[in-house]
Amino acid sequence: MAKLTKRMRVIRDKVDATKQYDINEAITLLKELATAKFVESVDVAVNLGIDARKSDQNVRGATVLPHGTGRSVRVAVFTQGPNAEAAKAAGAELVGMEDLAEQIKKGEMNFDVVIASPDAMRVVGQLGQVLGPRGLMPNPKVGTVTPNVAEAVKNAKAGQVRYRNDKNGIIHTTIGKVDFDADKLKENLEALLVALKKAKPSSAKGVYIKKVSLSTTMGAGVAVDQSGLSAAAN
């Protein structure tokens, strides 16, 4: 059996794996246990009452968190003409068409989000094998294929998170940094849950938001009591 590190022993002693914590208590506990030498992210896992094997029950989308994620986001935009100028004005680091595609083919991937106008998809389509595995392929379902690239850039910069359930019907994303005020983390979580409720598939039956857990980058998961979350009400 692997030997527990001091950090893991502290987490094991502090976190009751059988308990659902009030949201404020959960955040306080996460902050107390976040002792890494960097500012850890606060991540959320939301178990949804869906059958992930059925395509019509998969949940995918994006939402802007009211207090952002605390991350600095670099944006690449495939577009041309007036849209290119608008994207630059909105703060995009990289803007182009074939020239940008060539950079990416050479392995130059210094960006976190890729946005494209519809007319640019003929170029972006050639990059599927490069962007797809990294989760960077633009998609209209998450607002990254759009005629209004400037707005999409602003959303990305403002702290937009994209979400997509995994094969077990669980959404994994981030809601901020551990040094955020507790109220800001709670409001970000509420905003995400509201977005997930709006994205509920019509064919999903029963309890939709089954479980909500929070964790930090290096910490253990803490289950959250949904009765303290207005947005989680089914």
From Swiss-Prot:
One of its GO terms (molecular function) is rRNA binding. The keyword Ribosomal protein applies. GO terms for cellular component: cytosolic large ribosomal subunit. GO terms for biological process: regulation of translation; translation. It holds the Pfam family Ribosomal_L1. The keyword rRNA processing does not apply. InterPro entries: Ribosom_uL1_bac-type, Ribosomal_uL1, Ribosomal_uL1-like, Ribosomal_uL1/biogenesis, Ribosomal_uL1_3-a/b-sand, Ribosomal_uL1_CS. Keywords: Repressor, Ribonucleoprotein, Ribosomal protein, RNA-binding, rRNA-binding, Translation regulation, tRNA-binding. CDD domains: Ribosomal_L1 (cd00403). Signal peptide: none annotated. PANTHER family: 54S RIBOSOMAL PROTEIN L1, MITOCHONDRIAL (PTHR36427), LARGE RIBOSOMAL SUBUNIT PROTEIN UL1M (PTHR36427:SF3). Belongs to the universal ribosomal protein uL1 family. Part of the 50S ribosomal subunit. Binds directly to 23S rRNA. The L1 stalk is quite mobile in the ribosome, and is involved in E site tRNA release. Protein L1 is also a translational repressor protein, it controls the translation of the L11 operon by binding to its mRNA. This is Large ribosomal subunit protein uL1. The gene is rplA.
